[in-house]
Design a protein with these regions (language model features):
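Acyl-donor (CoA/ACP) binding surface of acyl/acetyltransferases
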Residues: 1-31, 56-185
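Short linear motifs in intrinsically disordered
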Residues: 13-14, 47-49
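Conserved GNAT-fold acetyl-CoA-binding loop/helix
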Residues: 27-48
Length: 185
C-alpha cells in the first residue's frame, strides 16, 4: 500500500536495525504497552514473532525507504476487542523523529481504506492508554469516536495495570466522513 509520503509493506528480517533504532527509545514502546528493545537481536525476534503476522505492515518513508514505524489490523482471534469476523483492531506506533509530521494519520487512513474496501470490515476498533495523547489525537483526526474507558487494563509486557480508552470507527462513519470532508482521504 502507498500514500503520498509512505509505503506500507510486510516486515522483513533486514528491517531489524531500523526497528531497533526507534524501538530502543523509552518514549516509544512503553507508552504503547511494550518495553524498549535492548538490542538488534530482540528487534529481529520481534519481527519474526510479532510483526511477521498477516495485516501487519512496516511504515516506510518514500524518500529514504527506511522503516519509521509499524501499523497493523488485528483480526478475530488476535484481539480482545471483538470476536466478529467483520471487525478488527488497529494498532500503530512511529519513531520519535517522525512525531508531529502527520505521518501516522496518513498511514492510518490508508489502512482504514484497506480494512473497509479490501477486507470488508464493518468496524475498526482502536485503543490507547491514558496519557498517550498522540495516539488519541491520531484516532480523533481519523474519525474514531471514544466508546469507553476502563480504569484497570492489564498491560502484560510492562507488568502494569493502566487506564485504557477504546475508540471505534464504523464503515458507514468512515464513508460519511470522507464524503463530507471532515476526515481527509
Amino acid at each position: 500500500m502507498e500514500t503520498k509520503r509512505l509505503v506500507l509493506r510486510r516486515w522483513e528480517d533486514g528491517d531489524a536495525a531500523d526497528l531497533y533504532e526507534y524501538a530502543r527509545d523509552p518514549d516509544v514502546g512503553p507508552i504503547a504497552g511494550w518495553p524498549a528493545h535492548a538490542n538488534v537481536e530482540e528487534s529481529l525476534r520481534t519481527i519474526r514473532g510479532v510483526l511477521g503476522v498477516p495485516e501487519t505492515y512496516a511504515i516506510c518513508s518514500k524518500g529514504t525507504g527506511r522503516v519509521v514505524g509499524s501499523i497493523s489490523l488485528k483480526l478475530k482471534g488476535s484481539t480482545d476487542l471483538t470476536e466478529r469476523d467483520d471487525e478488527c483492531e488497529l494498532g500503530y506506533w512511529i519513531g520519535k523523529p517522525y512525531w508531529g509530521q502527520g505521518l501516522m494519520p496518513e498511514a492510518v487512513r490508508e489502512v482504514l481504506r484497506h480494512a473497509f474496501e479490501d477486507l470488508g470490515m464493518r468496524c475498526v476498533w482502536a485503543g490507547y492508554y491514558d496519557g498517550n495523547d498522540r495516539s488519541r489525537r491520531v484516532q480523533e483526526k481519523c474519525g474514531f469516536r471514544c466508546q469507553w474507558t476502563t480504569d484497570e487494563v492489564d498491560v502484560p509486557l510492562m507488568h502494569e495495570v493502566r487506564k485504557g480508552h477504546v475508540s471505534r470507527l464504523t464503515k458507514d462513519e468512515w464513508a460519511s466522513d470522507l464524503e463530507d470532508g471532515s476526515v481527509p482521504a
